[in-house]
């Protein structure tokens, strides 16, 4: 309950920010082995501002991992013959209740039943203020996803991105499904390269509001901002260490852009790369011991890895003559990046152990990949119908989503961490 309260508190303070453009989500493709799961309408969910069962169904369908079956309404969740739903093709059954409390909060309870064993697999009881009943539904979907796949769900996580309409730039935060959009920063100058802190309470980004690129860290709860780098020349590409204590960045203060490390509270800037080329787009490895970055030291942009303390670098990408924007999965096993092949900039993912790569996009102008915290999906910017849009693809390439807004461009996405 303590963790859930922390999540509610963080989201609640964010909710005080101004909501603006709503994302629209389009889904295509399905997983290779979908799990059939029946979801019943929650008892008395009409009392809640959120139709809990609808959010759960949408989350599970959006993942591509489940075939959702409408179980109708089950009025007594303590006396359910789950086995009877096996005949309807379901391997599992989701049931629940919603009850409004005298203090105005909502008691949201759910059970996950095995139709094969006719037994309870999991349950979750939550007390949620009205504005967070939707978050409660996401947490239930996360629990269903984890119990049935063995992988932690990402429906209660958030994403950050930049929208542009004319000369108006907005750094926005939304739920992973594009709902509940909140404004973090608005500017008449470009905002680029947002990067979540590991605890999900801060975002580092580059703002041109001082008529030059400057790196800031903004607390999403208090909105307090700290300047991390305002050196001579370009200050760009901030990226957090896994423990949140350091930020890798790219600075050009001595000439060619090189990789540096700074304290996440500001100060302590020290150089860790030293090449005659351009070294940029640094990303910490999952264990924080290495830095992946883009360098043209071999004559064209390729992805390299070096110690987080600096030193010699090893080249990681060899296929294609233009590979940029490295991003590492949370388990450290996969590398996502953008590769130019036949004139197209497309999203690829590489198994770092085998070096085997897979193209995940059929578009021609992909940018800024970002792994979901469970490593099963990648969020990136692309171009659709001549407009900038966001897309999500599963790491096997089977499930795809596209997120658009009604007007303007949406770009520079980054997927937030699991909330603690």
Q: How should each PLM-predicted stretch be described?
A:
Residues 104-107, 167-172, 212-216, 256-260, ...:
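Structural motif
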């Amino acid at each position: 309950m303590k963790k859930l309260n922390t999540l509610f508190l963080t989201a609640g303070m964010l909710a005080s920010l101004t909501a603006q453009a709503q994302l629209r989500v389009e889904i295509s493709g399905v997983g290779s082995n979908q799990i059939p799961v029946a979801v019943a309408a929650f008892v008395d969910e009409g009392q809640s501002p959120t139709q809990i069962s609808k959010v759960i169904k949408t989350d599970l369908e959006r993942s591509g991992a489940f075939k959702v079956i409408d179980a109708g309404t089950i009025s007594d969740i303590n006396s359910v013959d789950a086995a009877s739903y096996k005949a309807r093709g379901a391997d599992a059954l989701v049931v629940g209740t919603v009850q409004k409390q005298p203090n105005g909060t909502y008691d949201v309870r759910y059970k996950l039943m095995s139709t094969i064993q006719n037994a309870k697999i999991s349950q979750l009881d939550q007390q949620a203020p009205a504005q967070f009943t939707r978050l409660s539904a996401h947490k239930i979907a996360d629990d269903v996803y984890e119990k049935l796949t063995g992988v932690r769900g990402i429906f209660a996580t958030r994403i950050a991105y930049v929208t542009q309409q004319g000369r108006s730039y907005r750094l926005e935060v939304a739920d992973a499904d594009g709902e509940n959009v909140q404004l973090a920063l608005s500017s008449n100058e470009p905002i680029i390269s947002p990067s979540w802190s590991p605890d999900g309470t801060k975002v580092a980004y580059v703002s041109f509001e001082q008529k030059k690129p400057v790196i800031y860290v903004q607390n999403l709860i208090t909105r307090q901002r700290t300047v991390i780098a305002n050196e001579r020349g370009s200050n760009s590409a901030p990226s957090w260490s896994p423990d949140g204590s350091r930020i890798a960045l790219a600075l050009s203060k001595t000439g060619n852009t090189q990789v540096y490390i700074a304290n996440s509270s500001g100060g302590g800037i020290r150089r860790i790369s030293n090449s005659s080329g351009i070294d940029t787009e640094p990303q910490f490895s999952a264990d924080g011991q290495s830095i992946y970055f883009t360098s043209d030291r071999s004559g064209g942009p390729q992805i390299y890895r070096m110690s987080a303390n600096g030193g010699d670098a090893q080249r990681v990408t060899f296929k294609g003559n233009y590979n940029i924007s490295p991003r590492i999965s949370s388990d450290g096993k996969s590398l996502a990046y953008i590769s130019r092949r036949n004139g197209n900039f497309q999203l690829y993912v590489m198994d770092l152990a085998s070096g085997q790569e897979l193209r995940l996009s059929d578009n021609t102008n992909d940018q800024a990949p970002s792994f979901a915290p469970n490593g099963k999906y990648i969020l990136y910017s692309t171009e659709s119908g001549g407009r900038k849009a966001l897309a999500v693809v599963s790491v096997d390439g089977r499930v795809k989503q596209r997120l658009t807004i009604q007007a303007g461009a949406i770009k520079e996405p980054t997927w937030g961490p699991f909330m603690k």
